[in-house]
A protein has these predicted regions:
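Non-catalytic cap/lid and distal C-terminal segments of serine-dependent acyl enzymes
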Residues: 1-268
């Protein structure tokens, strides 16, 4: 019997430092085996990469198998050194906007909130460092660039959509933490809505919101209410879709959300 570590030949990692704040990121990449389509590879960027990258990579591999598969895509996981599936302190900083502590509930573990409010620094990392690095290494389809996040990651997806909409073409928010800071994300949405109504978008945008049917009632309601409002703004450059995954709660919904996110990128 020979026992050895199990690795995938198309997986690789790199360490990149955000020059804005000197924080390190471990970046996970799943490279396609097939040649790109004529317009290049689509790319799905997955937040919480330590925990979610491999699920996204294998779902993408299955959905792009020939002869019936969709065009190949690259999966990029944004994670942290150290190997934890979810680095609580780092993600709490990266995926949140600034908030007053009195506007936040008590944490389930009773501990104080860690440092918060680094979302715009992470957006800068995407825009100025990570995405240019991927584009230098691969032939990329600029019209097939997706951002996926779950929970606080879903909040970050919405924040990026509303404040830096040209960065991606596809936005997938799974079980978004709309409750954050007394639903301050809705103020960003109102500003984005004004921009949208003025036809002041530089690129076509596609958004998918997902939530589990067995999640907390306010999580389902918040997502549905926001998605319904966004759907009323449908136009040539703005499309919004909704998926309620029945019988799934906040954790079990993740794999189904990733599957729908990948298919959403590859088919729209």
């Amino acid at each position: 019997m020979i026992i050895k570590p199990y690795t995938k030949p198309n997986y690789e990692t790199m360490l990149i430092t955000n020059t804005v704040n000197d924080l390190d990121y471990e970046i996970f990449i799943a490279k396609p085996f097939d040649e790109p389509a004529k317009d290049g590879y689509g790319v799905i960027y997955v937040l919480d990469g330590n925990g979610l990258f491999e699920t996204a990579a294998e779902i993408t591999r299955l959905l792009t198998r020939k002869p019936k598969g969709y065009h190949s895509a690259i999966v990029v996981g944004i994670g942290y050194p150290g190997g934890e599936a979810f680095d609580t302190e780092r993600r709490m900083y990266d995926l949140t906007m600034p908030a007053e502590l009195e506007n936040l509930p008590q944490r389930p573990n009773g501990e104080p909130w860690p440092n918060l409010g680094g979302a715009d620094e992470l957006i800068s990392f995407f825009e100025n460092e990570l995405m240019p690095t991927i584009e230098q290494q691969y032939v990329i389809d600029k019209h097939k660039q997706a951002l996926f996040g779950h929970s606080l990651g879903g909040l970050f997806v919405l924040h990026t959509l509303y404040t830096h909409s040209s960065l991606f073409s596809h936005y997938i928010a799974s079980s978004a933490s709309i409750w954050w800071n007394h639903q301050a994300i809705l103020n960003e949405y109102e500003a984005f809505k004004c921009q949208l109504l003025k036809n002041d978008l530089s690129n076509a945008l596609k958004t998918l919101m997902i939530v589990g049917g067995d999640e907390l009632e306010y999580m389902v309601k918040d997502s549905l209410d926001l998605c319904t409002s966004m759907m009323s703004l449908h136009g040539p450059n703005f499309e919004v879709s909704w998926a309620l995954l029945e019988h799934e709660e906040h954790v079990s919904v993740i794999s189904g959300s990733i599957s729908r996110a990948v298919k959403f990128l590859l088919t729209t």
